[in-house]
A protein has these predicted regions:
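RNase H-like nuclease fold core
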Residues: 68-122, 126, 134, 247-255
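A cross-kingdom feature marking charged/low-complexity
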Residues: 58-74, 233-242
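Short aromatic-glycine-(Arg/Gly/Cys) micro-motifs in beta-strand/loop hairpins
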Residues: 1-41, 55, 59-62
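RNase H catalytic domain
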Residues: 82-83, 88, 128-201, 205
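Acidic two-metal-ion nuclease catalytic site recognized across multiple nuclease folds
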Residues: 216-256
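Acidic, His- and aromatic-enriched active-site or binding-groove loops in soluble protein domains
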Residues: 170, 208-220
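Short, surface-exposed amphipathic charged segments that create phosphate/polyanion-binding patches used
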Residues: 57-61, 200-208
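Short arginine-rich
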Residues: 36-47, 60-64, 134-141, 210-215
Length: 256
């Protein structure tokens, strides 16, 4: 039997009653002591010690927006995907936010139905990949990706099995930005349709790309709250998914 190495990124030592981090162990019997019954434990087995070390060095985190202490000063990008049953096409969208100001919006739809078996997941993965590429392109070295599909993180980290070409391509793409381009990527899980306005905007723009009727979540929020956008170009894009009576609460930051 080939030897395995067990990398424990986060676990717990019940004997010392302390959290443990960044351990490399050489047996499952040792590993299980630190991960069994531990909520949120992060660990993985590898065939070589080098792979285990690289796993521990990965500049990638998976947090929850409600409980996670994610950085507030880096660029935040909200991603989403959608799927049209009739056309069998998917769409992607992402909304980039810096210092509570929407600075960029991007969306689009597939040109064919070759990924219909993945439904909206194809759009989710494309949105995250494009978001990281956008952040890198404007000179950011750290980005927080807010998502409601868990695979956005797990397919990037390699903790889920990659069965289709899309997830394999996504994994390779993200690993290149992590390891060769030295991007620090923080993944933050949000609950879909929970009232998070930027997440709702991402959902609306993904649906817009497929001509799917929009939910009322954005308008409901804007009836009592304001948002800020960086310029008139983004303002114009925002109003394409907002009812006219709510425009007063969309502020252009440069005109304040």
């Amino acid at each position: 039997m080939s030897k395995k190495y067990y990398a424990v990124k986060e676990g717990f030592d019940f004997n010392s009653n302390e959290q443990v981090k960044d351990l490399i162990l050489e047996s499952w019997e040792e590993c299980i002591k630190y991960v069994k019954g531990v909520k949120g434990a992060k660990y993985k087995s590898f065939g070589t010690r080098v792979e285990a070390i690289n796993f521990l060095k990965e500049k990638m985190e998976n947090l929850n927006k409600v409980t996670g202490d994610y950085p507030k000063d880096c660029i935040h990008i909200y991603v989403d995907g959608s799927y049209n049953i009739d056309s069998e096409k998917y769409a992607f969208a992402f909304v980039a936010v810096k210092d509570d100001v929407i600075i960029h919006i991007e969306n689009g739809a597939s040109t064919d139905n070759s990924k219909k078996q993945l439904r909206q997941i194809a759009g989710e993965l494309e949105a995250a990949a494009r978001a990281v590429e956008y952040a890198f392109g404007i000179g950011e070295t750290e980005v927080a990706i807010f998502h409601d599909y868990a695979g956005i993180y797990h397919h990037a980290a390699g903790t889920w099995e990659r069965k289709d070409a899309s997830s394999k391509e996504y994994f390779n793409f993200m690993q290149e930005f992590l390891n060769k381009k030295n991007m620090n990527i923080i993944f933050v899980k949000t609950d879909g349709h929970s009232g998070d306005i930027y997440n709702e905007f991402a959902d609306s723009f993904a649906k817009q790309a497929l001509h799917i009727p929009l939910s009322r979540a954005v308008d409901t929020y804007l009836q009592h709250n304001c948002i800020k956008v960086i310029n008139k170009q983004i303002w114009d894009k925002i109003i394409s998914v907002v009812k006219l009576n709510n425009l007063v609460n969309i502020l252009i930051a440069s005109e304040e």
